[in-house]
């Protein structure tokens, strides 16, 4: 979860559910909190991702964004889990799943259309708008993110 407000013993947190941006109040006794000094910013207009840890840029790369009919959703999301894939897969070696979902698709690949940051088997597409809503990045960069960003890292996606 990402805490968005703190009122005494109550925390308002982002939830990994539809619709994107859903928040709920939880009592501090129900959760364990920690401070994460990592952040990812994705600028869709510039088609660029910048990731920082402790204020230091660890990745600054062009990206593939969602196509016109399957756009990448905007807003604050957070990193929920990593999935390892085979090196030559369409997703590259790692998928960094986020707390958001496609707003254009009801289902994807037999399941819910979770938005993710992942590698690619088509590096020539980097810089284009041609995904189903996910952010595709070079495989060497997704490895850096996997090794550096903890679960819960906030991800801000801007138009």
Predicted regions and their residues:
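Short, surface-exposed loop motifs enriched in S/T, G, D/E and P with embedded aromatic residues
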Residues: 1, 62-63
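Gly/Thr-rich phosphate-binding beta-strand-loop-beta motif of the actin/hexokinase/Hsp70
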Residues: 48-49
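Exported/periplasmic cell-wall-interacting domains
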Residues: 30-38, 60, 67-78, 83-159
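Short, surface-exposed charged micro-motifs
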Residues: 2-3, 39-41
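SH3/SH3-like beta-barrel superfamily modules
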Residues: 1-29
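Short, surface-exposed beta-strand-loop junctions and turns on beta-sheet-rich folds
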Residues: 17-21, 55-59, 152
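A short, compositionally biased micro-patch
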Residues: 6, 43-45
């Amino acid at each position: 979860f990402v805490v968005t407000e703190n009122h005494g013993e109550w925390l308002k947190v982002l939830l990994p559910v539809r619709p994107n941006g859903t928040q709920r109040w939880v009592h501090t006794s129900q959760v364990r909190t920690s401070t994460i000094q990592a952040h990812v910013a994705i600028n869709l207009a510039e088609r660029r991702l910048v990731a920082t840890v402790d204020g230091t840029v660890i990745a600054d790369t062009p990206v593939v964004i969602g196509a016109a009919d399957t756009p990448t959703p905007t807003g604050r999301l957070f990193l929920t889990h990593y999935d390892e894939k085979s090196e030559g897969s369409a997703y590259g070696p790692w998928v960094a799943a986020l707390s958001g979902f496609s707003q254009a698709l009801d289902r994807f690949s037999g399941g819910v259309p979770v938005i993710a940051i992942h590698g690619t088997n088509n590096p020539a597409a980097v810089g284009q708008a041609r995904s189903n809503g996910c952010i595709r990045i070079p495989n060497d960069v997704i490895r850096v993110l996997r090794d550096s960003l903890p679960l819960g890292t906030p991800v801000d996606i801007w138009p």
